[in-house]
Regions:
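Short, positively charged
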Residues: 2-163
């Protein structure tokens, strides 16, 4: 299943990636930091990327294409003295042997990187990474955080394909 690999407030991502002001505003509507600017949004708390104009959608896509290497590295590896060099996945399925794999982080970064697109559900895909509003949290403000998710089990299918 899917696992959250990074979750922060938009202002913290802005400190890392320096969003252009127009993009920052789009992402504020996306996370719900700002109330929707359109009539009859799918969700009264926020806007989905599919609800923005084509030009606004292109701004989002172009920024994440241009900065994909930096963004994926920050999300999966991190920065500074605690940056990860390895990626461990443990798979426990009922009534089956435990499986695990340990991969160099750069292989994992390459595996999860790829085409940047807006999904039909209004989130962003950066390769195999999903960017979405955190949501949940019973209406608490922390639902407005931005999160990135992956399915770590996909690394097991990559090994099977090569064998």
């Amino acid at each position: 299943g899917f696992n959250q690999v990074d979750k922060r407030w938009l202002k913290n991502y802005n400190e890392l990636w320096n969003f252009p002001s127009e993009l920052l505003e789009i992402l504020q509507y996306f996370t719900g930091e700002k109330s929707p600017k359109i009539k009859n949004p799918k969700d009264k708390r926020r806007m989905f990327l599919t609800e923005f104009t084509k030009e606004e959608q292109e701004q989002v896509i172009n920024f994440f294409i241009k900065n994909q290497a930096l963004i994926v590295n920050d999300i999966l590896k991190g920065r500074g003295q605690f940056a990860s060099e390895w990626f461990l996945v443990i798979l426990k399925i009922e009534k089956q042997d435990l499986k695990w794999l340990l991969k160099p982080i750069n292989e994992v970064i390459n595996f999860y990187s790829g085409e940047v697109l807006i999904t039909d559900r209004g989130s962003l895909k950066i390769g195999k990474i999903t960017m979405q509003r955190k949501g949940g949290d019973n209406g608490r403000i922390s639902a407005n955080m931005l999160q990135f998710k992956i399915n770590p089990c996909e690394l097991f299918t990559e090994i099977i394909k090569r064998d």
